[in-house]
């Protein structure tokens, strides 16, 4: 079932969208109380409502860069950061993305800051939501996106900090290479007028957020360790922090480089409480690239580092349980499957530890030329 957008988000968007256009084409729009960004593009004007009270750190980054009040590696203080940036990534039905500065000294702000997730209030459940792009958890910089549809599967991994309240037709018309000409910040009301980020205030927010993130990661690690001890107390730790237990011994020798292993496996994400693949069940619940026992060619086929290393060392008939830390699995990038019409997109979130059961059904020597 497709996740429905939060009603609270929609209500906020409607309130923010109370933009009253004054009579006469030459007069400027008037806004209800709030913080806005007028994004002038070569296609026309897009107006964003920024959630500076719910996501103050992320809004401070955007506003501080837009107005040149936060130090960065690309430009000196006072220089608007986003003026002239291109929409360098446009994926129909997904997002438009920009934020790489037109600078000869740097292609990013020279800093990163943590995620600021506010669910269910701020989600990706509809077109027009504004979020931060990143290269993994807590690596936000200056690149940001506008959704072009329901992208609910992004919830929890990317910070939503605003929404489009005017110019969605312009957003839908943006093509790769189109340009953000200027970004003007509009403050209406006492709270918004007091929101004036500086380098010092932004850094203080980031440091406070890092403390929160460090504690959350420590709590998650402790929960993982408790789960492993409770369910797999006999698992032995191997290379890279991967733990394993032999469920069934095999015969013969492991495959040679270039050899072929006929393998079956199942995988699950214990903390999320979900299974994501099982070759014995035709690939269910996710019909991935390996819906049945498959040929794994040592040194060529790639699943993830832990699975690859295990299959390369297993004998015919051997079955293992693998407990895979994120660093040996899908790391900070996670796994985003190809979306199928009418289905919720399958996702393994970044920094997720996984458990596999792997069985070697057959081992064959390298093919001769």
Regions found by a protein language model. Give the residues of each.
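Bacterial N-terminal signal peptides
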Residues: 13-22
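Cross-family detector of peptidyl-prolyl cis-trans isomerase
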Residues: 24-369
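Generic secretory/membrane-interface signal
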Residues: 4, 18-19, 61, 65
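Basic/polar N-terminal segments that are highly enriched at the extreme N-terminus
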Residues: 1-5, 22-29
């Amino acid at each position: 079932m497709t996740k429905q957008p939060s009603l609270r988000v929609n209500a906020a968007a409607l309130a923010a969208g109370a933009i009253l256009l004054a009579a006469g084409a030459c007069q400027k729009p008037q806004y209800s109380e709030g913080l806005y960004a007028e994004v002038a593009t070569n296609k026309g004007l897009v107006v964003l409502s920024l959630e500076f009270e719910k996501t103050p750190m992320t809004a401070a980054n955007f506003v501080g860069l837009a107005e040149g009040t936060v130090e960065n590696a690309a430009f000196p203080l006072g220089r608007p950061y986003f003026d002239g940036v291109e929409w360098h990534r446009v994926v129909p039905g997904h997002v438009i993305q920009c934020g790489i500065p037109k600078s000869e000294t740097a292609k990013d702000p020279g800093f990163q800051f943590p995620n600021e997730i506010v669910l269910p209030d701020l989600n990706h459940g509809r077109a027009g939501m504004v979020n931060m792009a990143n290269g993994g958890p807590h690596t936000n910089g200056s690149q940001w996106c506008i959704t072009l549809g329901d992208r609910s599967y992004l919830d929890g991994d990317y910070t939503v900090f605003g929404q489009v309240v005017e110019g969605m037709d312009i957003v839908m018309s943006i093509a790769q290479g189109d340009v953000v000409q200027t970004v003007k910040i509009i403050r209406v009301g006492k709270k918004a007028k007091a929101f004036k980020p500086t380098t010092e205030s932004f850094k203080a927010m980031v440091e406070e957020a890092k403390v929160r993130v460090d504690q959350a990661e420590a709590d998650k690690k402790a929960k993982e360790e408790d789960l492993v001890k409770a369910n797999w107390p006999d698992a032995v730790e191997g290379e890279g922090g991967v733990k394993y237990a032999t469920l069934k011994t095999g015969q013969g020798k492991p495959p040679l480089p270039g050899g072929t292993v006929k393998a079956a496996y199942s995988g699950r994400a214990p903390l999320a409480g979900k299974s994501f693949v099982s070759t014995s069940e035709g690939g269910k619940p996710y019909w991935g690239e390996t819906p049945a026992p498959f040929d794994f060619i040592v040194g060529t086929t790639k699943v993830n580092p832990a699975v690859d290393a295990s299959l390369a060392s297993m004998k015919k008939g051997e079955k293992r349980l693998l407990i895979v830390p994120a660093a040996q699995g899908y790391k900070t990038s996670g796994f985003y499957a190809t979306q199928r019409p009418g289905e919720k997109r399958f996702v393994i979130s970044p920094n997720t530890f996984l458990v596999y059961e792997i069985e070697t059904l057959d081992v064959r020597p390298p093919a001769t030329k």
